[in-house]
Swiss-Prot record:
Specifically methylates the guanine in position 1207 of 16S rRNA in the 30S particle. Its EC number is 2.1.1.172. Monomer. Gene3D superfamilies: Vaccinia Virus protein VP39 (3.40.50.150). GO terms for cellular component: cytoplasm. The keyword Transferase applies. It is found in: Cytoplasm. This is Ribosomal RNA small subunit methyltransferase C. InterPro entries: DNA_methylase_N6_adenine_CS, Mtase_sm_N, rRNA_ssu_MeTfrase_C, RsmC/RlmG, SAM-dependent_MTases_sf, Small_mtfrase_dom.
């Protein structure tokens, strides 16, 4: 994190107004402004493990990664600065959670890019902290209000689920394909054959649907699942539990917290980080897989057909094959051999 996002640049236009504020930053924290902003005190809460990694280097214990904020995260903050994400249910979940912990009268600022739907903040918070737009620049909006009424927040009420092939998939706001199985994952699932064995790592596990489906017809697999998203980690744990399946699930920035080697790595890697297009996670996945695959181990990923993954696969492993495709998606497979670049 170094360059500021457009949303942060809009906030900096008002930096003099925050010099005496004790601020809690939350939402889609794409840069390190929370660590560098000049104010009386600064704390941050994030559901994204990679954002926590970046901010904790400067903020230490004043930034926390978790599914829900707690009273200790709010502490004595008198101001909330919330960065609007592209996912409206995710924003509602986070805002209702955080505002339920803050006392009436605190200042509430919401900032985000217009294309993210930040205008939705006004009707969303109308009953709790009526907002007014105070700035519009860099194709972003900045809104301000004061908390008049604390919302009620119960984590249990935010859980949702859907079924696929007899499996119960548990989901939360902010989890990829929360409302049902996406087409890409469906294509990848079609290539996973019964009686698969060995250690399988599911990177970017989302709600855990790939691992649950694999384990349902291949009971001898040993599952490890990871994701940068706290909602995804909790949803995957809940999905495994709901279907009587076992597996280790934890937060990781691709391989950052992964130990050991595996017989198969599966993934539907993201190519967005918030509103921004980013191939970083997929490149890290492909290039880093050689350090986490056993000899003869397999990497199998699904991706939009237009993304430049074949080149990276060939550079890293020496070859790749397409084992399934539609007009929009391709499933790539490659194997750990001596020619792979370790």
């Amino acid at each position: 994190m170094s360059a500021f996002t457009p949303a942060s640049e809009v906030l900096l236009r008002h930096s003099d107004d925050f010099e005496q504020s004790r601020i809690l930053f939350a939402g889609d924290l794409q840069d390190d402004l929370p660590a560098r902003f000049e104010c009386a005190a600064s704390r941050a809460h994030t559901q994204q493990f990679h954002h926590w990694q970046a901010l904790s280097r400067q903020m230490c214990d004043n930034v926390r990664f978790s599914l829900v904020a707690q009273a200790s995260d709010v502490a004595d903050c008198d101001t909330l600065i919330y960065y609007w994400p592209k996912n409206k249910p995710e924003a509602q979940f986070q805002l209702m959670n955080i505002l339920s912990l803050m006392p009436s009268g605190v200042d509430v600022f919401v900032v985000g890019e217009n294309r993210s739907g930040v205008r939705s903040a006004e009707p969303m918070l109308a009953d709790y902290a009526p907002l007014n737009k105070v700035d519009s620049a860099r194709r972003c909006g900045l809104y301000h209000g004061r908390l008049e009424k604390q919302p009620q927040f119960s984590l249990e009420s935010w859980w949702a689920e859907y079924s696929i092939d007899g499996l119960t998939i548990k989901t939360l706001p902010g989890v990829f394909s929360r409302d049902g199985l996406d087409v890409g994952s469906q294509l990848l699932l079609s290539t996973l054959t019964p009686h698969t064995k060995g250690k399988v790592l599911d990177v970017g596990c989302g709600a855990g649907v790939l691992s649950a489906a694999l384990a349902s017809h291949s009971p001898k697999v040993r599952l490890t699942l990871c994701d940068v998203s706290a909602p995804a980690v909790e949803a995957s744990r809940a999905t495994l539990a709901a279907n009587g399946l076992e597996g280790e699930v934890f937060a990781s920035n691709v391989f950052s917290e992964v130990k050991g080697r595996f017989d198969m790595i599966i993934s539907n890697p993201p190519f967005h980080d918030g509103m921004q297009t980013s191939l970083d996670a997929a490149q890290t996945l492909i290039r880093g897989a050689v350090r986490h695959l056993n000899s003869g181990g397999e990497l199998r990923i699904v991706a939009n057909a237009f993304l430049p993954y074949p080149k990276i696969l060939d550079e890293t492993f020496g070859f790749h094959e397409v084992i399934a495709q539609t007009g929009r998606f391709k499933v790539y497979r490659t194997v750990m051999t001596r020619q792979a670049k370790k």
